[in-house]
Amino acid sequence: MEKTMSNSTPTPAAHRLGLVGRKVGMTRIFTEDGESIPVTVLDVSNNRVTQVKSLESDGYAAIQVTYGTRRATRVVKPQAGHYAKAGAEAGSILKEFRLDPARAAEFAAGAVIAVESVFEAGQQVDVTGTSIGKGFAGTIKRHNFGSQRASHGNSRSHRVPGSIGQAQDPGRIFPGKRMSGHMGDVTRTVQNLDVVRVDAERGLLMVKGAVPGHAGGDVIVRPAVKAPAKKGA
């Protein structure tokens, strides 16, 4: 946890270095006391710096990183030139992290960021991914509505939402009304997940709980924005 003096300015949440990777799946870890902790395994190995941006050339300081691999036939020429200029292998995902100018200057294009240099056990992180798509779903599944009566005069309206508005006045359905529709397949962030273990050798990050998306889906891991301060910090 970062400690700051009363007369100093804490690092903005948008200026913290993260990593990109993929969701491997879920398992459990047993502590020395025999406690079973459900964890999600995230592969954040081989994060490569593809570009370093500075105030002088770009107007802000940031680094761009890539993860994974992509076949040469799937890389368009502008991207191929971008990767070649950085001296980095083409990846499946690109992500930019804004940093303080001094922090961004520590990196060079083509460098590999090790997971242990960014995260440590006991830290809290925010994980962003694409949720699992459920297709077209009704209000009971999509919005946790209650169902109508199973009998006693109800024959065809067991799972309908009921009234969705008023009469001729206002004569419309208000925006934001919860109704049936496409469910899932949206970007979601789970906040304040505890880092249970960091496997530096294999580049794995194990966080407590679940993260959005299928196994094999792309994820972005950042230091937690709303991490509670430790007592005495």
From Swiss-Prot:
Gene Ontology MF: a single term: structural constituent of ribosome
PROSITE patterns: RIBOSOMAL_L3
Residue ranges crossing the lipid bilayer per the database entry: none
UniProt xrefs under Pfam families: Ribosomal_L3
Annotated stretches, region: Disordered: 146-171
GO biological process terms held by the UniProt record: translation
Annotated keywords: Methylation, Ribonucleoprotein, Ribosomal protein, RNA-binding, rRNA-binding
The UniProt record lists the keyword Manganese: no
InterPro entries associated with the record: Ribosomal_uL3, Ribosomal_uL3_bac/org-type, Ribosomal_uL3_CS, Transl_B-barrel_sf
GO CC list: cytosolic large ribosomal subunit
Modified residues (N5-methylglutamine): Q168
HAMAP family reported in the protein's UniProt record: Ribosomal_uL3_B
Task of the protein: One of the primary rRNA binding proteins, it binds directly near the 3'-end of the 23S rRNA, where it nucleates assembly of the 50S subunit.
Family named by the database record: Belongs to the universal ribosomal protein uL3 family.
Protein name as annotated: Large ribosomal subunit protein uL3
